Every structure is written in structure tokens, then in C-alpha cells.
From Swiss-Prot:
Pfam families: PrmA. SUPFAM superfamilies: S-adenosyl-L-methionine-dependent methyltransferases. GO terms for biological process: methylation. It is found in: Cytoplasm. NCBIfam families: prmA. This is Ribosomal protein L11 methyltransferase.
Length: 320
């Protein structure tokens, strides 16, 4: 037997009351989709691990709210809907406007829970050479030069199509010539490490402060045989890392890039490149100045929408 989702279209001010009604009438879980919540989000807001939030990339309502309650198979739906409609209408007696107060129900196939979200993800060409492909998609490269980055978007840390990721993939395409060693800081899904291997990088290390991210990266790396030898580990930025590589890449936010800058400089060979993005436009000058103050030479800046990427290099002795 299948579960039932009962959806109440309502106003922002009535969301809490409607949620209570659904719970009180037997819903085992409630989901709130409120336009007001999306309006509060600002580009660059981030969580404890520097997750990037760009509201324009999130599916959302333009106005009002929808509160969905999930009811077990034993529920007598017609009676439940009538009860909910009556109780929602009475909210006006308590000074709340529940309009439009539409109530509808749909049956949920148990099998749909696991796979319904997959219909929103399709192969995306992110650079001339690189295409991101969801794990379940059958996809044939259009040209001999096209390289595939196979990801499982069902994991945490996104699909690789955010503007900052696109900037980093473009930067990798510019910077890599083949055989370079690289450290991927804040690897998340592992997409940059996979792309680097596809573009000819040599030895690659992928670090993240979050062990969930590292597990996600490992699974995605396993989906791409070319990246099977990428080293992974839990680490805070480059704390305790002392090596010499050709590239350090980081798609993290400005506040987190700043303490990374001296660590990146230390871990790069002379002439090595530092590629970074996750920089919202209001923080671009601050990050650029910090990179230059450390001794880097900024070679190129790139922009998509409100986000910036920077390609810089550590001067070789002959440049002094």
C-alpha cells in the first residue's frame, strides 16, 4: 500500500498553524515550501564547511507557501481532507489569513521515494571539453575530445553545475598541460579532482574538513576509473600538509580562502598555480589583494554572474 501526501496551499503567516494541523491529524512528517524563506537567502551564505548557496539555482516558490503532510497507508483520505479543510478555514477566527487554503492529496508510490528526484538531473556540458553526467544516465560523448565527469547528485555537495564549479573547471582547462601534481582543497563531490585527472593531471590529493564530503568524493571517484588513484583524506584546509605540488585548487568561499592563501603558497613549487573560486563579487577585491600580498602573481580573473575565479602563480626565481 502507498502513502498519501496532503498539500495545503496557504500564506506565510499561517505556515506554523497549518503544520500543526497536519501533524495533529496524523501526518508523520511535514515539509514546508515557503517563498519567504528563499527571499531571505543571499549569495555567499555558507554553512560550517563553506557550502555555497546561490538562491537562483534553487527551485522555489515565487509567492505564498505550501505545507505537505505525509500520511501512512492506513489513512482514510477523504475524511482527513475534510477535517483539514475545516480546521484551516477556522484559522481566520484566530487572526490568521490562510488563503488560498487549497487542500489536495496525491498518492505516493513507495518506489518513487528513491528515484523521483532523478528526473531533474541531466548531462550538462560545462566547458568545451567537460560534460557532467549523472550516474544513471546513458550518455555518449558528442566528440572525441569530450570528457565525462560521472557524478551521483543524490549525495551531498551538489551536482557540479554551480557557477563557481564551472569557473574552476574552466581554470583547470587553462592551467593543466599534463602530468601536474595537484591538491584539491575542500573537495566536496570530488568533481575537480575527477576533472583534473580527465585533463591529464598526475598525482592528486583531495581533502575536505567533513568526513561526509570525503565519503561522497570517494564514491564519485570510484565512478570514474581514471580517478581511481586520487588520494583522499579528512583535513582542515592544508593544516599539517607540507609538500610541493604544481597546482592547489579550492572552490570555497572568500572567508575560507583567506587563511588558505599562505598555506597554498607554501605548498606550491616555484611557478606553481593557485586556482580558486567561490568568491562573491563583494569579496573579490579583498581576496585578490590577499593573494597578491602573499607574493602570488594574478594571471587571470574570471566571472560568471556574481561569482569570481582567480588563476595565480607563485613566482619562479627567474622572475625575481
Amino acid at each position: 500500500m502507498n502513502w498519501t501526501a496532503i498539500v495545503v496551499e496557504t500564506s506565510t503567516e499561517a505556515v506554523d498553524a497549518v503544520s500543526y494541523i497536519l501533524t495533529d491529524t496524523g501526518a508523520t512528517g511535514v515539509k514546508i515550501d515557503d517563498a519567504a524563506d528563499y527571499q531571505k537567502l543571499k549569495p555567499g551564505k555558507y554553512g560550517p564547511y563553506g557550502e555555497i548557496v546561490d538562491p537562483s539555482t534553487l527551485p522555489h516558490r515565487e509567492e505564498g507557501a505550501a505545507v505537505t503532510g505525509y500520511y501512512p497507508p492506513t489513512t482514510f483520505v477523504p475524511e482527513k481532507i475534510a477535517d483539514i479543510r475545516q480546521r484551516v478555514a477556522k484559522l481566520a477566527d484566530f487572526g490568521l489569513n490562510p488563503a488560498p487554503a487549497r487542500v489536495a492529496a496525491e498518492e505516493i508510490d513507495n518506489q518513487d521515494w528513491a528515484t523521483a528526484w532523478q528526473k531533474y538531473y541531466h548531462p550538462v556540458r560545462v566547458t568545451r571539453e567537460l560534460t557532467i553526467v549523472p550516474q544513471w544516465e546513458e550518455y555518449t560523448p558528442a566528440t572525441a575530445d569530450e570528457k565525462l565527469l560521472v557524478l551521483d547528485p543524490g549525495m551531498a555537495f551538489g551536482t557540479g553545475t554551480h557557477p563557481t564549479t564551472q569557473l574552476m573547471l574552466q581554470a583547470l582547462t587553462i592551467a593543466l598541460r599534463g602530468g601536474e601534481s595537484m591538491i584539491d582543497v575542500g573537495t566536496g563531490s570530488g568533481v575537480l579532482s575527477i576533472a583534473a585527472k580527465q585533463l591529464g593531471a598526475g598525482e592528486v590529493w583531495a581533502y575536505d574538513i567533513d568526513d561526509v564530503a570525503v565519503k561522497s568524493a570517494k564514491k564519485n571517484l570510484a565512478l570514474n576509473p581514471i580517478a581511481k588513484d586520487v588520494h583522499t583524506g579528512v583535513n582542515s584546509l592544508l593544516d599539517g600538509i607540507h609538500t610541493q605540488v604544481d597546482l592547489v585548487v579550492a572552490n570555497i568561499l572568500a572567508e575560507i580562502i583567506l587563511p588558505l592563501v599562505p598555506q597554498a603558497f607554501e605548498n606550491l613549487k616555484p611557478g606553481g598555480k593557485f586556482l580558486t573560486s567561490g568568491i562573491i563579487n563583494t569579496k573579490f577585491e579583498t581576496v585578490k589583494k590577499a593573494i597578491e600580498a602573499q607574493g602570488f602573481v594574478v594571471d587571470e580573473t574570471m566571472r560568471i554572474k556574481d561569482w569570481y575565479g582567480i588563476i595565480a602563480h607563485k613566482p619562479a626565481p627567474e622572475e625575481a
